[in-house]
C-alpha cells in the first residue's frame, strides 16, 4: 500500500518497485494510507515514535529487533502495545532458524534434562559497522547482534535473567571512525539456576569467507546441543571463493527464517492469534542488553531490572 523513507529518492524507488505510494513522513503515511499492518525497520535507536504512533492508529505492528535501545523507550512501546487494539510482534527471527527451532524442540522434549549452561556467539566482520550501517556509531555489536542471542537463550531457558557481569573492549572501530565498542562478553545468571555466556564482536576481519559468525551451545543435565551456523550453506569456487547468501527466493517466494517470522506475524493477524514473541519479550530483551552496557561501564555485576 505504502512505503516511507526520510530520503525521498529511496522512498520513490521502493514505491516504483512495488507499485505503492511513497511518503517521507511516517505520520502522514499513517494518517493517509489505507493499511492494516506497519513494519518498522528504522535504525534501532529510532523505533519508539513510529511504533507507538502506529499502534495508537489501530494498526498491527512488526518491529525489528531490538524493540528499543533504552529502557525508557522499551517501556513506552510495551505500554502502547497493551493499550492497542492491534498486535505487536518484535522480529526475533532466529526463533524460526531451523537449528534453533530444533534445539527448542529437544529442550521441550526433555532430551537435555535440566538446563545448566548456554554459550551464544554472534559477530560480524568490520564490513557491517564500517560499510553496511551508516548509523553504527549510534549502535554497537551489543545492541545490533545480541538481541538475537539473548532472545534465543530466554526462549530456550524459559527463564528470566537475574544478574549480568559484562566486559567490553574498544579502540579498533574508533580508529576507523566508528564511535562504539569492538567486543562485548557477558555472563548472565537466570532465575532457573542456569548461566549463559554471550559474546559479540564487530571487528572480525573481512578476509573471513562469511560476514556473520554464529554459534550456540546448550548444556543440560542429560545432553548437549551445538549449532554452528557460520559455515553452513553453499560454497562455490572458481576464480574466487564465494559464499552465496543463505536466504533467497525460490520460485518467486521468499524462503528461510527471515521470511518465516514475517509469515508467522501475518498468519497471527489473519487467524487472530497472538504472536510467539510480543512486547514483553522485547522489553525483557532490552533490559538485559542495557544491563550489559551498564555493567561494562561500571566494571561490576548489575541486576536486570525493568
Where are these predicted regions, by residue range?
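NAD(P)-binding Rossmann-fold cofactor-contacting core
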Residues: 1-14
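Beta-loop-alpha module in the N-terminal Rossmann-like domain of NAD(P)-dependent dehydrogenases
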Residues: 7, 18-80
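Active-site loop of classical SDR/Rossmann-like NAD(P)-dependent oxidoreductases
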Residues: 6, 250-262
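Hydrophobic residues in well-ordered beta-strands that form the structural core
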Residues: 24, 63, 88-90, 119, ...
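Predominantly a Rossmann-like dinucleotide-binding segment in NAD(P)-dependent oxidoreductases
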Residues: 86-87, 94-178, 299
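Contiguous beta-strand/loop segments that form the cofactor/metal-binding neighborhood of enzyme cores
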Residues: 144, 150-232, 259-272
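C-terminal helix-rich "cap/oligomerization" subdomain common to oxidoreductases
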Residues: 37-42, 75, 265-306
Amino acid at each position: 500500500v505504502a512505503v516511507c523513507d526520510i530520503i525521498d529518492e529511496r522512498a520513490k524507488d521502493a514505491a516504483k518497485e512495488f507499485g505503492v505510494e511513497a511518503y517521507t513522513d511516517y505520520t502522514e503515511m499513517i494518517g493517509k494510507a489505507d493499511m492494516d499492518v506497519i513494519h518498522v525497520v528504522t535504525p534501532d535507536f529510532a523505533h519508539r515514535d513510529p511504533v507507538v504512533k502506529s499502534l495508537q492508529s489501530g494498526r498491527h505492528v512488526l518491529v525489528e529487533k531490538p524493540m528499543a535501545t533504552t529502557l525508557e523507550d522499551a517501556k513506552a512501546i510495551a505500554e502502547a502495545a497493551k493499550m492497542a487494539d492491534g498486535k505487536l510482534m518484535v522480529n526475533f527471527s532466529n526463533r524460526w532458524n531451523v537449528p534453533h527451532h530444533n534445539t527448542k524442540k529437544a529442550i521441550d522434549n526433555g532430551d537435555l534434562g535440566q538446563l545448566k549452561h548456554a554459550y551464544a556467539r554472534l559477530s560480524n566482520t568490520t564490513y557491517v559497522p564500517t560499510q553496511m550501517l551508516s548509523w553504527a556509531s549510534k549502535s554497537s555489536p551489543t545492541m545490533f547482534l545480541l538481541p538475537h542471542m539473548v532472545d534465543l537463550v530466554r526462549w530456550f531457558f524459559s527463564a528470566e535473567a537475574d544478574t549480568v557481569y559484562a566486559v567490553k573492549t574498544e579502540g579498533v572501530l574508533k580508529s576507523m571512525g566508528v564511535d562504539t565498542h569492538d567486543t562485548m562478553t557477558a555472563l548472565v545468571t537466570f532465575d532457573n539456576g542456569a548461566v549463559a555466556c554471550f559474546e559479540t564482536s564487530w571487528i572480525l576481519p573481512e578476509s573471513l569467507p562469511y560476514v556473520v559468525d554464529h554459534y550456540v551451545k546448550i548444556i543440560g543435565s542429560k545432553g548437549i546441543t551445538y549449532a554452528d551456523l557460520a559455515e553452513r550453506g553453499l560454497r562455490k569456487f572458481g576464480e574466487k571463493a564465494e559464499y552465496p547468501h543463505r536466504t533467497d527466493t525460490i520460485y518467486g517466494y521468499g524462503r528461510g527464517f527471515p521470511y518465516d517470522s514475517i509469515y508467522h506475524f501475518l498468519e497471527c493477524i489473519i487467524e487472530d492469534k497472538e504472536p510467539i514473541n510480543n512486547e514483553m519479550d522485547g522489553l525483557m530483551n532490552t533490559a538485559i542488553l542495557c544491563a550489559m552496557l551498564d555493567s561494562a561501564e561500571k566494571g561490576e555485576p548489575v541486576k536486570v531490572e525493568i
